[in-house]
From Swiss-Prot:
Family: Belongs to the pseudouridine synthase TruD family.
InterPro entries, per database record: PsdUridine_synth_cat_dom_sf, PsdUridine_synth_TruD, PsdUridine_synth_TruD_CS, PsdUridine_synth_TruD_insert, TruD_catalytic
Keyword Repressor listed: no
GO MF term (any one): RNA binding
Catalytic reaction(s) noted: uridine(13) in tRNA = pseudouridine(13) in tRNA
UniProt source species: Methanococcus maripaludis (strain DSM 14266 / JCM 13030 / NBRC 101832 / S2 / LL)
Record flagged with keyword Transferase: no
Protein name: Probable tRNA pseudouridine synthase D 1
Top class in the EC scheme: isomerase
Keywords: Isomerase, tRNA processing
Pfam family, one: TruD
Function, as annotated: Could be responsible for synthesis of pseudouridine from uracil-13 in transfer RNAs.
Amino acid sequence: MKFRQKHEDFIVNEILEYELNDYGNYFLYKLQKNGIENLKAISYLSKNFEVPTKEIGYCGLKDRHAITTQYVSIPKEYGKLSLDEDNLKLEYVGTIEKPLKIGRLYGNRFEIIARAVDKDEFLKIADNIRNLSSGAPNYYDDQRFGSVFNGKFIAKEILKGNYEEVVKILLTSYTKSEKKQLKDLKRFIAKNWGNWDECLEYIDKKQIRSKMFRNMVKSLTYENDFKKAFKYVDNRLKELFISAYQSYLWNECLKEFLKEVIPKENRIYVDYSCGTFLFYENIEEELFDKLKEMDFPTIVSDVEYTDPEKRIIKAILKKERIKISDFEKLDFGKLKYTKRPIISIPEDVNTGKFKSDELNSKKYKIDLEFSLKKGSYATIILKRVFNIL
């Protein structure tokens, strides 16, 4: 099975709830991008139209490896804007009263092509698509865990007081998609760990522009204090570290809860970057009706939980060898308390027929369209359909 062999294989259209009017102070635009990161697109608009980035409102980040359409708001004082480039387009929609904010959307519509399908998988895939009416567990998927390397969560290492490991992850771990210059730097630091003068000399010699790397390494040349070096990490990154670990714990709590209510014969396990997901293959209507009305809270230190949440959270934290009070040690960022629906139910599901795949010899492809409410991951639905065969 293959996804995203072309950007056209993964199309995302934002579903926004808004009211146009004639008296608002903001212009609403459709922003379509192809293979461009969200923040880079916003930065480009800012420079091109001389609009400060803080004045460009949007509801959420969209996938880079896709064709995406979302909405942005810009104050009327900058005039009506338009852009028509190959990979980035901006189209005026109308006038709204308030700027767009993160999270203020209904959801997203997805148009996805799954490729390299074998003929003997047709029946099972078709059956799985029919069963989408009973939804799927509403896990956070791999996109949430970009700061996790070799199964190590930076926030967890901080809770353990292991700041050297935190700094080592930040300065030496890399992904395939990172630029060669940065990968070379991280390899050099890993090879010369502790020789901070040499590492700083390398940064200057190669004219590496990253302030974070330079400041962290320079700090270590003065004093081998990894906790102090960590202070040079951007606060937005620190918040991502917390968010990633909190999301992982929520996933583990959901999995533990599902173990209590899903019979063993109906459990299916699917791997992901931080462990395994538990899916259900079939579910009784009575249980489904119960689950679709339920949510599960995120873990924070200042909330009194009741069973079954309290019991499940305690079990997961014991497995992680941390206590809920440990979260009070975090002197940066903030754990966010929210209640997240236990299951995600795709709306308006449409599917095409299996067709010959022009990109993969002797294989087939199939189109799948559906809508999800905000916060739910399309890739979880794809795992439910295509990984349970």
